[in-house]
Amino acid sequence: DEADMTSLKDDLKNYVDTLENDIKGRKLFYIKEVCDKELYKDSNDEVLMKVLDDFYKTLDKLREEGFIIEEISIDKNLLEAIYPSYMSISCAEATSNNANLTGIQFGPRPEGVDSYQELMMKARTEGFSELIKRRFILGSFILQKENQEKLFLNACRVRRLIVDKINDLFKTYDGMILPASGGIAPKFSDDSEKLSDRYLIL
C-alpha cells in the first residue's frame, strides 16, 4: 500500500537457504550476570536452577558442534536499567501513538453520551484492558512536562548505552545466547497483582 508507511514491498526470501552450514569457529557469548548459578545459590527456585542446568547443557552441545562460546560480564547497573528503560519508553510511546483511539473514528461506540469527551472516556474505559490502562497511565505520567527530562529522556539515554554496549560486543561475536526465560509461565493462582513488582520501579 503506497499510502501506508508501515507496509513493505519485498520479494519473499527463503532465509533457511541463506544459512551457512559451516558453523565451526562461530563465536557466541552469554552474560555472566544473567546465567551464573552462583548468583542464585541462595534462591530456592528449583525451576530456575533447572532452566540454568539445561542452558549449560545446551552450551556444551553447541561447543561439540564447533561453536566458540565465551562468558562475558556487563555492568550490573546497566542490566538492571533495561526493564525500567523499556517500560518508560514503551508506555510513553503507547500513550502517544494511541491518542487517536477515541471511539469516534473506530473502536467501541458507547451509547447514551452527550459530548465527545464523554464518548472518548467511555470508549477507553470499556475498550481497554486493565494492562493497557496501566500502561497509558504510566505513559501519561512519564510524558508530563515535569517528568520528561527525569524519566523519558533519561530512559532514552540509558537505551543508547545499552544499544552501544551490545553493538560493541557484536564486533567480536557472531551472536548472543541466553535462556529464553527464568522459569515457566505462572498459574493464574500464583500471579501477583502487586503493581510495585512490575511497574513502580522507576
Regions found by a protein language model. Give the residues of each.
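A short helix-breaking turn/cap at a secondary-structure junction
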Residues: 1-52, 117-122
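Flexible, acidic loop-helix segments that line cofactor/substrate-binding pockets
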Residues: 4-12, 26, 32, 72-87, ...
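Glycine-rich, small-residue loops and helix-cap segments
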Residues: 35, 51-61, 65-73, 80-83, ...
